[in-house]
Amino acid sequence: MSTPFKMERGVKYRDAAKTSIIPVKNIDPNQELLKKPEWMKIKLPASSAKIESIKNGMRRHGLHSVCEEASCPNLHECFNHGTATFMILGAICTRRCPFCDVAHGKPLPPDPEEPQKLAETIQDMKLKYVVITSVDRDDLPDRGAGHFSECVKAVRELNPNIKIEILVPDFRGRVTQALEKLKDNPPDVFNHNLENVPRLYKEIRPGADYEWSLKLLREFKEMFPNIPTKSGLMVGLGETNEEILQVMQDLRDNGVTMLTLGQYLQPSRHHLPVARYVPPTEFDIFRDKANEMGFEHAACGPFVRSSYHADLQASGGLVK
């Protein structure tokens, strides 16, 4: 009889060590992968001085960016523009979603000094718009909502003119309690990603629930009707276009006015494979449909991610 796998606290488990313990076994690391089309090939910028400056600034304050931890394909572009999405509550997630490159494991307790460190780093970077996200923290009674609130408070106190977008987890089973924690320090934009279609949730988002996520977006909007809510989806995981359109309609029915839609990319052979590459023309169709549904801002394109050019999208600019 094999010995049960035991995780050590504070250790990052990635790739096979992470996805091998997912109940739904649907990943074959030896299968042939789809070839990337030309439109999915990125030309990296020549200069990396700005990139290293941002990385060093985060290391200096002991902070993390989701750009690095999730291996975002837009890292070079965003860092070269002096923007980044900060990831609070550590870099170890209590979930093990097989599309995501963020490490799984038993996280360390939240750093009580992180809100102040975050505020000072943002001040040093002279940011006017910031996105703050986090790993899932199912180990915490409030799922990390109180820490989010403290971070928003600290950032505003030191940067009074800044616009803050928070990209939150689903606060598993604690939606009402989490929103109570957030109400004293609300953001300028509230973002929570549905990621994909409900039919594929068991494979793509183990531990999550489609209706929970809609409830979170709906209840925040009811609490703060004047603050825009936002959500993001990935395509290329086996869903149909009709299913994506239905999710978009569900978002509108629950008060969401900002949408991001991008191509899923496989972080490693131990993650879910890409089922198809969606051409740019189809993303244009999705954007047109989103506009017809009443989304005020819809960023749709192969490289769009939930916080990609978030400042531009929030101000009404075209992102694709």
Curated annotation (Swiss-Prot):
Its cofactor is [4Fe-4S] cluster. Its main location: cytoplasm. It is found in: Cytoplasm. Binds 2 [4Fe-4S] clusters per subunit. One cluster is coordinated with 3 cysteines and an exchangeable S-adenosyl-L-methionine. It catalyses: [[Fe-S] cluster scaffold protein carrying a second [4Fe-4S](2+) cluster] + N(6)-octanoyl-L-lysyl-[protein] + 2 oxidized [2Fe-2S]-[ferredoxin] + 2 S-adenosyl-L-methionine + 4 H(+) = [[Fe-S] cluster scaffold protein] + N(6)-[(R)-dihydrolipoyl]-L-lysyl-[protein] + 4 Fe(3+) + 2 hydrogen sulfide + 2 5'-deoxyadenosine + 2 L-methionine + 2 reduced [2Fe-2S]-[ferredoxin]. One of its GO terms (cellular component) is cytoplasm. One of its GO terms (molecular function) is lipoate synthase activity. [4Fe-4S] cluster 2 binds at C93, C97, C100. Its EC number is 2.8.1.8. SUPFAM superfamilies: Radical SAM enzymes. Pfam families: LIAS_N, Radical_SAM. Residues 79-296 form the Radical SAM core domain. Pathway: Protein modification; protein lipoylation via endogenous pathway; protein N(6)-(lipoyl)lysine from octanoyl-[acyl-carrier-protein]: step 2/2. Keywords: 4Fe-4S, Cytoplasm, Iron, Iron-sulfur, Metal-binding, S-adenosyl-L-methionine, Transferase. [4Fe-4S] cluster 1 binds at C67, C72, C78, S307. It comes from the Bacteria. Belongs to the radical SAM superfamily. Lipoyl synthase family. This is Lipoyl synthase. It comes from Haemophilus influenzae (strain PittGG). The gene is lipA.
